[in-house]
Structure formats: C-alpha cells, structure tokens
C-alpha cells in the first residue's frame, strides 16, 4: 500500500484535469450540400448529420439510376424534387408514389382491401412503441414522436424504389410472383415497411437493401461495347432492348449515324423472319419440273408453227398449180360455193354475171337427149357459163323440182376437156351427175363442196380434193393427169406432216414418262449410276450401266430418234437391276414396282411397250425441236 501511495504522489495530477471551456473538435469528413454548409457554420448534432448524410445518399442513388437508364422518379419535375432534398425543404415532396407511370396512393389513399391490413400493421407498431419501453429510457409513459424528416426521407426513398424498372431488380426485391393471381410481392412489403419507418437507421437499412437489389451491371455507366469491349463515350453508345448490352454506333455493322429512337435490337437479338424455303431436294425437283414444262410448251408451240407453215406452203403450191392450168384471172371473179342439199329440198347457187348464157338443170335434162357436141357417153352437158364462175347450179321450186329429185352434184375439174357445151366460147370440161346415182351413205351427198376453200386442212383429215373416187365421172384429157398429180402431192405432204407429228408426240410422251419415273417413290435405286468405290464388282457383271439421270439427259438433248430407243434404255436399266441384285432384295422389288408403273403409264400415253423390247419396223423420224 505504501508503494501505491508513493506512485500516486509522484504521478502528475494535471493530466486528469479537463478544461470546461474547450470546444469539442469534430472529426468527420464534410459532404456536399447541407451537411457541408452546416459543418462550416458550427457544430452539428448527430441526428442532423444522419439526416444530411441520408439526403446525400438518396440523391446519389437517384442520379446513378437516372444516368444509367435504369429508371426514373415518377414525379412531374425531377429537378424540383432534387432541389427540395438538397435545400432540406422536404415539405415540397409529392405525396404520391408512381410505379411505371401509374399513380400509386400512399397511406390513406390505398385501396379498400388493403386499408385494414395497413391500419392493423400501424396499430401494431404504435402499440409496440407505446407498450414496450426502451432499456435505457427513463420515461415509460409518453411515446417517442416520429420525426417529420424521417417520414419525408422515407417517402423520397420509396419514390426512388418505385421508379426503378422491374427488369433491373434482383433478389430480394426482384422476386415477383409469375402466377396469374395478383399477390403482394416482396417489393410491396418492403415499401410498406419503409413508409412505416420511425428512425434514420431503418431508412439506411432499406437504402442498402435497394442498392444491393439493383443490377448495376446493366447500367449504361458501366456498359462496355460488345464489339470493342471498351467503356466510355456514352453519348455514342446504344443499348439493345433485348440483351441490354452496349454497342457504339460506329462499331455496329452497318454503322449508325445517330442514336436511334424507340426500340433497337442488336444483330443477335433482332427478331428473325422465318423464310418459308423448301428443302433443297424439293426445291430442285420443283425447279426442274418447271423447266421441263417450259421446254414442253416451247416444243409444242414450235411444232404447231411448223405444221401451220407446212400447210400454208402446200396450199400455196396447190393454188399455184391450179392457177397455171386455168386461164388468166380477171377482175371481179367471184368464188362460188354450192350446198348440195338443203333440208327444205332446194339448193341455191350463184350464177355468173351473164345469166342469159346459162341454162337451168332440172330432172328433165337427165333424160338421154344430149344437146351439145361433147363426147360424153352417160353425161348430160351442162350449159356453159362465164369463165369467171367455176361452179354454177340452181334448183328452184318454181320449176317443179321435188326435194328428192332436185339434188344435183356439179363437179368441175380444172383442166380443158374436149367436150364443148352449148354456149359461147370454148368451154371447160364439166361433169354433171344426177343425185339418183349417188348412194345415201356417200360422203358427197350432204356436204358443201368448193375447190377454193381457204380453210386449212386438219392433219388427221384428208383434203376434200382426195374425196373424188374413180366411181365418179372421170375428167378427160390433160385434166385427169393434173388432178391425179395434185392429189398425190397432197397425200405425200399430209403423210409427212402426220408422221412428224406422231414422232414429236412420242418424244414428248417419253419426256413426261421420265419425269414421272423420277418422281416415283421406288426410283431411288435408279437415280444415279452405281459408284465403283461402293460396289467394286458391279461393272464386272454389268457391261452397259445406265440410270435415270442419263436417260433424262438424253431426252433433254433430243438424242433419241424414236420412242423405241427410249424404251430400250429403260428396259436395259431394269435388266441390269435384275441381273445384279437378288430377286428378294429391296432394289429388285423396287424395280418390279417401277417397271409395272412404267408399262401402265406408257400404255396410257399411247406408246407400244413390247415384251421383247424391239423397236417397230418403221418409225417416222422425229424432227429436233429448236430451243
């Protein structure tokens, strides 16, 4: 004890004396705004420092959210709202919090269904404040009043919280329910808790929770260009609305001259339009079919043009020969067409310009009393008409001609005969034959006849000049020879045109058959030649390999002269298949089905498919079509 007392006596006592007038020194870092001004003017209480610090943090998080395009405070004037916080005029803050543009009432303006829940929560909190005394408090009778600054700052933070876009929030505030039923989310409960805060510490807690729940990586302030991986130059950076990744307007391709307005998507997030494109196999088949149809149409048009040209040439040659045999043409010559029989029992005809030289032919003229000097035996000389009229005959009911006996067929042969009619000048050989000697089934009985018809003769029908039979009266002299020459020339021309048309029809049928074979489901073994690498011994067994692609190529190049060559190649393809493959294999079965299909289609198209695959003896040569 003596030692302790000795130590205390030697210890300087003045170190324990504290002067009462020494002003306290504040050791804190000054902040911006109101806190900085207050620190310069004098000492500030701890509660005021918390208030000023909270105002600065609220302004800072609001500015980062706004500059980073993560959201905005839903107030009429943002600058007025910020100035109210900076100047500590908290009464100017709006009483309404808006969420995504829609006004959301606070406190007493809540919906009816939430009033009871809200009121019960407030009553419970007030009851806890009134009934539960603090451990350090000495007054247990009066509750502590809530500061107005706490209420205003809580409302400001709630407005910021409601202004943040929901897609930029993460847990715990971003776990909204995805069910169809509207439920109270964590964010709503957090807002209720914030508005019921009674101290600055509670507001600080809600502020830190909000700061941790925001996706700051999506902010444009922290955005990196997806192309160049660089920050900065925010004025030239645009965010994709799909992935929220930044892109400089000069880094995207094609370059942008300015930041586009509205929604913008990067090339990866751009909505892709589905193109209704067919698979390559179907597209190739459709294209080839269209080309084949076009080629067929061109061939048919060219064939029709050639046939018309040949018919016109044959008609021109016939007219030239006839004009050479006749006298020089005169002006005013009229073409006369005589209907041989009418249903009314009368036949009309046109007479020449001088009817006084003609003579009407009636059944009385058919009696054996010839008047002219002609040498016909059983013919009745017709009155000579003007050379301008080739055929003339008239039967009228005025002369007492009955319907059955009034039919007179007048056939004029171009050629000068020896017989002369009773008229002026030198007449031409004309032959009249009574209708009594004409059979009812004869093709000449009910058909108008004219040698000057300009109508083209169909390819499958013989011209009218060929319908003259030897049973009719034959012309005499040179006219007979010339007429027979004309008939033979016309027969040869028609035979050539019909043969050519038949050959072209066969080749078009072959082309159609190839297309049908390629489209068939069982054509897969025959589409292309067998590869020697896959089947090495195939070419040792098969000496003449062939496939549908080769046949189709030969058809397109018009290498087949007749349909029999095409049919031989098709049968060679099947014989190769049956020779190499076993009869129970899939290839052989497909070949059998395809062969039966080919035979059926060929018969429907009019092609002759013989079992021995031999070509016909005579097939008219086919003319190659011009492409």
UniProtKB/Swiss-Prot annotation:
UniProt entry keywords in alphabetical sequence: Bromodomain, Coiled coil, Metal-binding, Nucleus, Phosphoprotein, Transcription, Transcription regulation, Zinc, Zinc-finger
Gene Ontology biological-process annotations: chromatin remodeling; positive regulation of DNA replication; regulation of DNA-templated transcription; regulation of heterochromatin formation
InterPro entries, A to Z: Acf1_Bromo, BAZ1A, Bromodomain, Bromodomain-like_sf, Bromodomain_CS, Zinc_finger_PHD-type_CS, Znf_FYVE_PHD, Znf_PHD
Protein modification: Phosphorylated in mitosis.
Domain (Bromo) ranges: 502-605
Feature: compositional bias, Polar residues: 386-395, 402-412, 486-496
GO cellular component: CHRAC; nuclear chromosome; nucleus
Span list, region Disordered: 270-503
Coiled-coil annotated residue ranges, if any: 281-327
Gene3D superfamilies referenced in this protein's UniProt entry, alphabetically: Bromodomain-like, Zinc/RING finger domain, C3HC4 (zinc finger)
Keyword set includes Zinc-finger: yes
Pfam families listed in its UniProt record: Bromodomain, PHD
Biased composition, class Low complexity, residue ranges: 348-359
Recorded superkingdom: Eukaryota
SUPFAM superfamilies given in the database record: Bromodomain (SSF47370), FYVE/PHD zinc finger (SSF57903)
Localization of this protein: Nucleus
GO MF term list: DNA binding; zinc ion binding
Subunit record text: Together with p18 and p20 proteins, it forms the Xenopus version of CHRAC.
PANTHER family named among the record's database cross-references: BROMODOMAIN ADJACENT TO ZINC FINGER DOMAIN PROTEIN 1A
Free-text function comment from the UniProt entry: Regulatory subunit of a chromatin remodeling complex, which forms ordered nucleosome arrays on chromatin and slides edge- and center-positioned histone octamers away from their original location on the DNA template to facilitate access to DNA during DNA-templated processes such as DNA replication, transcription, and repair. Involved in regulating the spacing of nucleosomes along the chromatin and have the ability to slide mononucleosomes to the center of a DNA template in an ATP-dependent manner. May play a role in transcriptional regulation.
Name assigned to this protein: Bromodomain adjacent to zinc finger domain protein 1A
